[in-house]
Amino acid sequence: AALMIQGADSSTLAQNTHCIEIVEQGLLVEPGSFVLDIKQAGPYFQKQGALGFINSFVKNALPGMKHPISGVVDVLELIYNTHPQDNFGLSLAVSHDTILAAIIAVISGRNTVSQEDWPRMMEGLFVWFEGDEFLESKLKWIWRGELNELSIREFQKLEK
């Protein structure tokens, strides 16, 4: 993230007046929010590769892993709680393609991820929330030009 900021700053001659705080969060790095026991889950990643592993994860078919909805809700709550409170704030969360692929599949209600679905290098997901409390909020997202939304409360009920 720091190198991305440095690169953006060096692309203009104008003095930048922004102040950007970088906060590292364990939920956004591998193994991230989804793994409960790396010793149980790790061999499946090695055997299946990234695409196979994420497909098994979104089907809730791996030992040592959270339920897919629970893992995704944890990441969404982190994003909700760390978003700047002013109207002009923007958060940039940097993660791995595996985590992004899982989040997109789960919030989209899909239990299969194809190679075409896989996030490309530097491809991003734009998310925002409407509502004053996370559990009562509505998640809205844009992925590859398509706008989607879901109720966090209703989404959590799907885990049961």
What are the roles of these predicted feature ranges?
Residues A1-K160:
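Terminal low-complexity/intrinsically disordered segments and their adjoining alpha-helical capping regions
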